[in-house]
Amino acid sequence: MRKRPFGLINLSYTTVRDHSVSEYWEGVMTKGQETKQEIVRKAAPLFNQKGYAGTSLSDLMDATGLQKGGIYRHFSGKEELATEAFDYSWQKAVTGRLEGVENLPDSVDRLKKMVDNFVDMRAGLVPGGCPLMNTAIEADDGNTVLRNRARKALQSWIKRLSRIAAAGIHKHEIYSRIEPRKLSEWIIGSLEGALLISRLQKDSEPLHNARRNLHEYLERNVRAKHARSK
């Protein structure tokens, strides 16, 4: 039988976007699957805070209350556990960033809401902050599997924003000259950069400045002029 790829589900970064973390593991699970889920849930904050290299076996044993054999009977090794922990952390971040977005009919308002969610939730709902930033920085010259996972997560986020922008252009809410992907990359880069500065300086002001600047740009340069009076 062919071994399934890493992940508690067949995770597609282009489609996993509108579901809560509870739905992430939806379905009837065996006792072993429940244990595996619980290990991932408890390991996720460790990997997000300490990184792949910094998370030791003793850390995992302390967090899960299991011995080495009890942990790795469910995973092929530390890399698989770290990958599934990233999936879990990223899905929680995605769920938070999309909160309330679908309720807004206007495309620019949707983009602004995602900016607000990022800033207000500090980019993630797992201790340690944004799992994408944390994993990308650590894995840049390190673990290839985790780096590829982070790259796919980034692409899914870019695609999500791009779809909103493209829909706005189609509905004449956004100027047709706007390039959805470039706009999406700029928004993400602004937020992640501001988050990095805020974390280093232990000051949330850079994030709030980024929010203000992004909102202003979206209203002045992205929202189509005729749509402003609606």
Regions from the PLM with identified roles:
Residues 2-50, 54-66, 80:
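Basic, helix-initiating cap at the start of DNA-binding domains
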Residues 2-29, 109, 113-120, 155-171, ...:
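C-terminal peripheral helix-coil segments that are non-catalytic and often amphipathic
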Residues 34, 38-45, 49, 63, ...:
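Alpha-helical structural segments
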Residues 49-53, 104, 125-128, 171:
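Short coil/turn segments at alpha/beta junctions that flank glycine-rich nucleotide-binding fingerprints
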Residues 65-75:
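Short hydrophobic/aromatic patch on the recognition helix
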Residues 110, 124-145:
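Amphipathic alpha-helical segments used for helix-helix packing
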Residues 176, 180-184:
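Membrane-interface starts of transmembrane alpha-helices
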